[in-house]
Amino acid sequence: MKTANCPSCGAMLTFRSAVSILTVCNYCKSTLIRHDLALENVGKMAELLPDPSPIQIGAEGIYRKTRFTVVGRIQLRYGQGLWNEWHVLFENQRSGWLGETLGNYTITSLIQPPEPLPAFPELRAGQNLTLRGRAFQITNIETAHCIAGEGELPIRVGAGYDAPVVDLQATSNVFATLDYSEAPPLVFIGEQVRFDDLKLTRLREALPAGWEPDAGIKAQSFQCPGCGSALTVRAKGYTETLACGACGSIIDITDANFRILSKFKTQVTHEPIIPLGAHGTLENAEYETISYLRRAATVEDVDYEWSEYLLLNRTQGFRWLVEYNGHWSLVQTTTEPAQVTGYGAQGRAFHQGRNYQHFQTAKAKISYVLGEFYWRVKVGERCEISDYIDPPRQLSLERTSKEIIWSLANYVEPDLIKAAFRLEQSLPVRSGVAPNQPSPYTAQRPKFRRLLWLFLGLLIIGQIATLALSSDQRVHQQTFVFDAAAKDKALTSEPFAVSGRDSNLFIRAETNLDNNWIYLDLALIERETGASYAISREINYYQGVDEGEKWSEGDAGDEAALSDIPAGIYYLSVEGELPPSSPTVTCTFTLFRDVPSWINFFLALLGLLIAPLLLSWRARAFEGARWAESDYGPSGKGEPEEDND
């Protein structure tokens, strides 16, 4: 650490980092270039634009178990709004950068260019580059404009200089920036980080005057230069443009005179379900609704339109709340690109350990805007959107000529939206199935599976017990001879005893039929009470030789069952009917008591399978309704590949 006095005002200056070559005096705002111990005053530094960043010089944090201190900042403006690069000094004296853009944070360090890089005009969004043997994808190409700097910095900066920059992403949240303001380009590599993971302390306690501490949003009112309507800016420092709902003017908020950038005309005025300025708590963070837009896409001459609400939290940044046909999703951009494989129905996107299936690709345009936006929004602005789903998540890729943006959406139940924003009016009724709507039947499968195994186990145990307890006792056997010419066709068996609990009684008949039939009327009669259990059976058996091949039809034997027969003394009454010219037929009847049966087991098993089969059918119907809206529905390009996972 070195100290020196400001040559302009005499204030004490401290250089904490050995690589710092520039400092801005905190008192007189002189820009001072360091030449060993001498300081050269190169003029006044421009004023920083006020913003709601919670970070300030002197803030401390931890990254990968190493402490760091914020010692300087460069503030830039690019197409998406304000961008802060905080110069940080680690306790091991290593220098790095904490990037802050729209609530997204990165930690990067300057490295030597690993290989010659393409010229800036040659680069395109979506193009792949290899840095240090790792594959990166270009996600954004911008020319940023420096607003001002503060604190100590390792490079010379000043208001107004242009910085052509290229952002690149790789897997595992690895992030890189190419700065073409110098030759050869400066290369910064690091990773995306979460604000909470940095464990930052000594943050800005007092926000600029008028900012609300809870939401971190300042409300500023002015009159629309197009129609005079009262307008409110809730996110100054983030907001680039504001759309007036009264006249359709899109206003440049960064301009002191609130210059009108464009106007749009619409015959339909949309009223947001969630009012602008409404606060709501989602995923344990409080957000304020600052804008609303409508997007539209036309697929096979069918128009689809949906609503998007822009939410802001001071530390968590921006989120999008998307509503389509009464379905809601909370969306966050991600700096980690997905690995895309296959095309069409076989298209897959792998991201952070999850496998997403391609759902649809369409060209969308902004059809209506209201409120404030962090970029220069314009009605008619177009992009191509590809959606991949793994309910309840949806991974989306938005592509323009200058950038590609990956975002992750989580399905949110409408009741949670209504409660989060304390809405009194009813929300739109859900229609159809959303791409990332979780199937209620899929969620029930584990429960049904557990119950199925439980009842199947009980059923098997019950059947085993039935088999073990059944006596399968032969109680009587007797042979009868039936004559077609006999006048008295009724025959009666000798009495026999049936003992034990109420149970079944099987009657088995074995005959000497050969190319013949017999019709039997059987009656099991209890001798004391006269209780009768009747049953009729027909037995037939035919055989022969046809063109040298033997054939047969029917069976010479038969079996019938009577259920719930109580104990007692019984006899069997049998009456047989034969063809008029039939020879005599011998029939032996054998009666078995308490015979183990499988019929009830299989009927119960069939009953058990009805519920899961019904569940599976309803789950397939639900998925069919989901995919009917995709590129692979009835009017789409084909059927999606079935996922058996």
What is each of the regions a protein language model found here?
Residues 74, 293, 511-513, 524-526, ...:
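A mature extracytoplasmic/lumenal domain signature
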Residues 86, 309, 546-547, 559-569, ...:
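Low-complexity, Ser/Thr/Pro-rich intrinsically disordered linker/stalk segments at domain junctions
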